[in-house]
Amino acid sequence: MNPLEDSKANPFEIAKQAAAVIAEKTGVAQHDIALTLGSGWAKAADIIGETVATIDATEVPGFSAPAVVGHLPTIRSIKLPNGKHALVLGARTHYYEGHGVRRVVHGVRTAAATGAKIMVLTNGCGGIKETWAEGTPVL
């Protein structure tokens, strides 16, 4: 059972636990920026820097395997050219999946707990127009 399903559990404590696991598994004590890349955007992480570590999301408290096509089951730590570290969240939960808001915002809470002061969110928005494929940029 995901610990966020327990209504008595403190979601901020679970985010701190998740951040501790991420620090342990990546060897990176603090991340400076976090990115949630929408469907089709995973390759963007490959060009922003050097991957330090890739973690199976199910090994991190509060995260689970993605239920949406195009999402990755991973959390990555990337060293940027300026020496800072980016946390890339491939696994996340959408509200329409029916797990509640606590699981939806867990990635952002965890990113903040890792030290990230900047969060970049992207989405695939593939359902808006049939001619758009995964990764089509929309502003």
Which positions does each model-derived feature cover?
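Metabolite-binding pocket within alpha/beta catalytic cores that recognizes anionic/polar moieties
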Residues: 2-139
